[in-house]
Each structure stands twice: as C-alpha cells, then as structure tokens.
C-alpha cells in the first residue's frame, strides 16, 4: 500500500484478538511437500543453506514466508503465500520501528521512492514489507563501466525527481549514493530510492545540519570544511553531482586510496570532465558540483536543465566517434580507475 500523509498506515496485528490464541511468532512449523525442506516459525531461524542439500529454514509471518537474508540479519527475501509475489522484508525492533520509519510516514507517495506495502507487528519485532527490486545503480554502472548519455539522462532524471520530492516534503537524505537507488523493473529502465531510513526530517524551512553523515566519496566540501552547520539540501545536491559524474564517466570525480588525500581533493573542488561528454552534460555537472553551496542548482532546478530535453539521436552522431573509443573504462590503471568507485 502507498503511504500518504493524510492516511494512516494499516497495521496488521496477529495474535492480538480474542479469537487468536497464537501470535505469528509462535506459529507451529509448516512442512513443505519435500521432506528435505522445513520451515521454522521463529524469525531468528532464517538463514541461507550452507549447502544445497541441507534443509533451509524460513519463517511464516502472517501471510508471508521469510526466506534467505539479503542484507545482514535484518533484511529478508519474502514471498506472499497466496499470490507468490516476491517482496523484501525489513525487520526492526518493535520499540524503534516508528522512529526509523518516520520519514516514510511524513512523505507523500512518489513513483521513484520505494513504498511500504504492509507492516506486521509481533511481540518484539516489526516486519516491514517493500516491493522487490532488480538490482541497484552502483552494481549496474559497475557492470556497464559507464552509461551513454541518453540512458544516464533517463535514469538520473528519476533519481533527481525522487530527491526533489523529498526536499519539497521537508526531508534531507544525507547519505545519497548510487547504491541507494534500485531498479523497479527487470529491464532496468525505472529506478526508485531504496529507503528513507537515513533521512532527516526538517522542522520548518531551515535545512541546516551539523552532523557528518554520508559516504566519503559523495561528501560535500562544506561538510569537511566546517565544524558548524551546513545546508543539508545543498549537500544532497552535491551527492547528486557525484552520482551523475560517475554514471557518465565510470569513476568518481574525486578519488584517492588515502582518505586524507581524497578529502583534500574534495575540499578544492577541482575535477576533470572528459571531452567525450556533450556540452549540456558538462554544464549540468559543473552547475551541481560547485564548491560554494549557494551557487549549486537546487534539486528542482536540476529537473529543468536542458540536458534532459536533448535530442540524443543528434547528440550521439556529434559525439559518437569519441564515445566509441572511450565507452568502457580501460583495464589499465585498475587501482586508479576502479577501486575508488567499486569498493
């Protein structure tokens, strides 16, 4: 289900009514048709099989089966018992799930932001179900080495649209990076922001933050340069610029194995843009990755940039000769070109 600001989320509670004698965390074991596969009713049990021949324990949570972990011990692949639909389930302590999901509850639905479909409350855990995904942007760009401008424009517009919606709704995302965006379809043409768990809810128009939150390669100069406050929205925009550059070039604009050297490069704000990119793409990158926060485009202004309305069939013919020889990141200098991005 979609989460709307004016509509309370529907919470399914199992084992709370007088007609229920068992909580879903205490359900009896369900046996599959094959004797070698057993199902455990306890959330703590799910784990990937050590070998294909060993039994694989899963959990029955309401009308869902929780299968193997996808990330750590709190994110699981889930399957709807009746429809067979595949989802993702995140597990939170019951005492803090509302705080963790507060940004989701205060933001209206958007096509490029992952939506909660259902929440089930147990005695000690909250099970939050999301639509499944088809990989993340980081892995996709790593596989492709870099993207052609037409594809990058289509995907980056969706990314910027999600960020602009969050900013308009009073959220600062703080930890923006390619890995945070996942694909909605197998064709990998539509993306969405994976979660809002790291977002900060603003109390009014002031977007000043003081925490040092984010991935080193995506952090903005002002976060490194000041011990005071900075504009959270402008810092998000800087991270968008790093994402766009990486999508088009195949590596971070600022990269170094040593963190101190990396931060020095970010503070200076100097980077090189390959000549293979079109003038409009270069313009957008430079308009975002400006050292002075007040000079950067806003997330909404990014969406209005003429690069997105480019006739790429004409643009490709003008710059195609250069792109053919520079489409993939070369294998030489692997440490320089790949490690800063693929870590």
Curated annotation (Swiss-Prot):
An example molecular function term from Gene Ontology annotations: mitogen-activated protein kinase kinase binding
Ranges of residues in domain Protein kinase: 61-308
Main location, first listed in the record: cytoplasm
SUPFAM superfamilies xrefs: Protein kinase-like (PK-like) (SSF56112)
Compositionally biased region (Polar residues): 29-45
This protein's record includes keyword Cytoplasm: yes
InterPro entries registered for this protein in UniProt: Kinase-like_dom_sf (IPR011009), Prot_kinase_dom (IPR000719), Tribbles/Ser_Thr_kinase_40 (IPR024104)
UniProt entry tagged with the keyword Lipid metabolism: no
Location in the cell: Cytoplasm; Cytoplasm, Cytoskeleton
CDD domains: PK_TRB2
Record's keyword terms, sorted: Cytoplasm, Cytoskeleton, Protein kinase inhibitor
One of the GO biological process terms: positive regulation of proteasomal ubiquitin-dependent protein catabolic process
Cellular component annotations (GO), alphabetically ordered: cytoplasm; cytoskeleton; nucleus
Coiled-coil blocks: none
Tissue specificity: Highly expressed in peripheral blood leukocytes.
Region (Disordered): 25-50
Stated role: Interacts with MAPK kinases and regulates activation of MAP kinases. Does not display kinase activity.
Family designation: Belongs to the protein kinase superfamily. CAMK Ser/Thr protein kinase family. Tribbles subfamily.
Record's subunit section: Interacts with COP1.
Record note on domains: The protein kinase domain is predicted to be catalytically inactive.
Other comment: Antibodies against TRIB2 are present in sera from patients with autoimmune uveitis.
Protein known as: Tribbles homolog 2
Organism of derivation: Homo sapiens
Gene name of the encoded protein: TRIB2
